[in-house]
Curated annotation (Swiss-Prot):
<feature type="binding site">
    <location>
        <position position="85"/>
    </location>
    <ligand>
        <name>[4Fe-4S] cluster</name>
    </ligand>
</feature>
<feature type="binding site">
    <location>
        <position position="82"/>
    </location>
    <ligand>
        <name>[4Fe-4S] cluster</name>
    </ligand>
</feature>
<dbReference type="InterPro" id="IPR010722">
    <property type="entry name" value="BATS_dom"/>
</dbReference>
<keyword id="KW-0479">Metal-binding</keyword>
<dbReference type="InterPro" id="IPR002684">
    <property type="entry name" value="Biotin_synth/BioAB"/>
</dbReference>
<dbReference type="Pfam" id="PF06968">
    <property type="entry name" value="BATS"/>
</dbReference>
<feature type="binding site">
    <location>
        <position position="285"/>
    </location>
    <ligand>
        <name>[2Fe-2S] cluster</name>
    </ligand>
</feature>
<keyword id="KW-0001">2Fe-2S</keyword>
<dbReference type="GO" id="GO:0051537">
    <property type="term" value="F:2 iron, 2 sulfur cluster binding"/>
</dbReference>
<feature type="binding site">
    <location>
        <position position="153"/>
    </location>
    <ligand>
        <name>[2Fe-2S] cluster</name>
    </ligand>
</feature>
<dbReference type="GO" id="GO:0009102">
    <property type="term" value="P:biotin biosynthetic process"/>
</dbReference>
<feature type="binding site">
    <location>
        <position position="78"/>
    </location>
    <ligand>
        <name>[4Fe-4S] cluster</name>
    </ligand>
</feature>
<keyword id="KW-0004">4Fe-4S</keyword>
<dbReference type="GO" id="GO:0005506">
    <property type="term" value="F:iron ion binding"/>
</dbReference>
<keyword id="KW-0408">Iron</keyword>
<feature type="binding site">
    <location>
        <position position="213"/>
    </location>
    <ligand>
        <name>[2Fe-2S] cluster</name>
    </ligand>
</feature>
<comment type="similarity">
    <text>Belongs to the radical SAM superfamily. Biotin synthase family.</text>
</comment>
Amino acid sequence: MTSATTAPHTTQTLQFHPRVAESVATQRGEGWSIQAVQELLDLPFMELLWRAQATHRAHWPQGDIELATLLSVKTGGCPENCGYCPQSAEFDTGVKAEKLMSVQEVTQAAQAAKDAGATRFCMGAAWRAPKDRDIEKMSELITAVKDLGLQTCATLGMLQSHQALALKDAGLDYYNHNLDTAPEYYSDVVSTRQYQDRLDTLRHVRDAGINVCCGGIVGMGEAPVHRAGLIAQLANLNPYPESVPINSLVRVAGTPLANSEPVDPLDFVRVIAVARITMPKARVRLSAGRQQLGDAVQALCFLAGANSIFYGDKLLVTSNPDVEADTQLLAKLGLKGTPNQTTTETACGA
């Protein structure tokens, strides 16, 4: 009887691309260079996702998904010319200017959002820069929503320092003011304000003690280096934002960017992953454009470190996955919403 001959045992290991060092400057607290961010974006896709997921698990072990609802409380008629925005008065998009909603209308919408599972309620108004009387009216809305037990967020345009303080006194938890893109590409998107105007507003918000919500848009015709520049700008804010919404451009007929080339879905996932790596303690939010991504790409975004979504059938004036679709997606992925809380978060380290 002869014994069977077996092949010698061999061990196979996955070979990952050498890790990109977070740059000596970053380790010394000097911030992220555009080159260092670009090197992350250029990593092989699976290596990048592995690193982003490792970072995410280290800082967000509970693995929950924050559900935020965004309501346009004052729609249209904005004098700005942001090339992506259907609410600009300069573009013929079919969006009609409307007055500020009443306290009753807003609280009804906020209660419905809470009943559907949202924990944060965001209010957007299409102003370039609100007047003091607008801030007084918004303060009433903020207090009313806060009384429902929801976290509050507002995006109202450029703020002065005393206006930010008034919003803080009203109970505002977060203020959204996106950088949109890198400073080098900003003038290609909007010419009615300067990049520094956005940075100044963010400083007023931070000085008032309000948490910062700040991100950008992918797919506006920007080059890869501009995506790296945007992430570097966000990560180098001191401290970096508590919430970082990443939008995939929704191409709206009548806007200058309506014919922009759609962003490659995997490139969008890359931006999510690098946002997670460079801002590990931030809530990285899947924002506008989720509907065009599909379930599989959204799942990759969650794997890459996204842990917040805008939840509800509409985002300002553009469509969003309906609540039932999101509920089913999260259930399929085994993801759960964040427990409700109204306390503000501590600032993220730079």
